[in-house]
Amino acid sequence: MRVLIATAQVPFVRGGAEMHAEGLQAALTAAGHQVEQVRLPFKWYPPERILDQILATRLLDVTESSGNRIDRVIGLKFPAYLVPHPSKVLWILHQFRQAYDFWGGEMDDLMQFPNGREVRDAVRSADQAFIPEARAVYANSQNVAARLKRFCGIDAAPLYHPPPGAELFRSAPAEDFLYLPSRVNPTKRQLLVVEALALCREPVRVRFSGPVDDAGYERAIGDRVRELGLGDRVDRLGPAEETAKREHYARCLGVVYPPVDEDYGYVTLESMLASKPVITCSDSVGSLEFVRDGETGLVAEPTAEALAGAMDRLWGDRAQAARWGASGRELYDRRDITWQRVVATLTRDA
């Protein structure tokens, strides 16, 4: 089958969505399909640019290439998933969230514009009109599926995939640190972990790694670490190469991961692959699809006090932490989170 993966990317910005698309391309190729990935450059400012991109996507013809039919289109991200094709299947990573759950909140950068509401309504109308064109609609997590249903009235089945290099993760004896590998961004709430660390009764240490998305937030974290006198209990490693990151996973006592309203997030799955328990928050959403309180980790309220209590509990009972980590790995294996399953689902006749 000749398959085209349709996605979007902000030029020179690389994250989980890009790794997701590459993983899908590799899995389809390994299954014997001929695959091409098309990434539309995405720019969301000024807001009217979004309308131009919706129109441009709808005008694309991807039914054939050089006279050869394209058998299947798999759409991943807005606005690329709006491209018309008679045999299109959607595997939605996320919609344009500023038009949905981010609207009117701290993460909203659309409402401030005079035409923001008009653009929001146009995005919603396009999704509601054109997503149902697909033969089948899947989401990369239950959270994304629930958001699609809530705002657009569209049903989507969650279809899970493994993180990059899943087969390379291992577990090692736990050392004296908790690990938080994630982009430095307010939505990942590293600052909340710092505040919690200051309230811990146990001598908890936290190791942070990840690229900086928000330089101001990175400075705020450093300032707060100094103000609270936590310099000897916080390691800020910056971006970590994949091999080094897997080694941190292998040797940590557990992973603390408190993002706000996460869609999927590789961190939880990577922790499970390394047989490490996860501390997350009750509003982290995506991680809650895998973190079961008192079974594979701990779920705390998103306050410094509650998070500190969870960190203390994990730190103070190493045997329990190991049992929760092993349970997480067993849960991952039972879920059959494999690329083979993904490929079979996305290429079957709908």
Residue ranges and their predicted role:
Residues R205-G222, G238:
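Glycosyltransferase donor-sugar binding loop
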Residues A306, R313, Q320-R335:
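A short, well-ordered alpha-helix in the C-terminal region of glycosyltransferases
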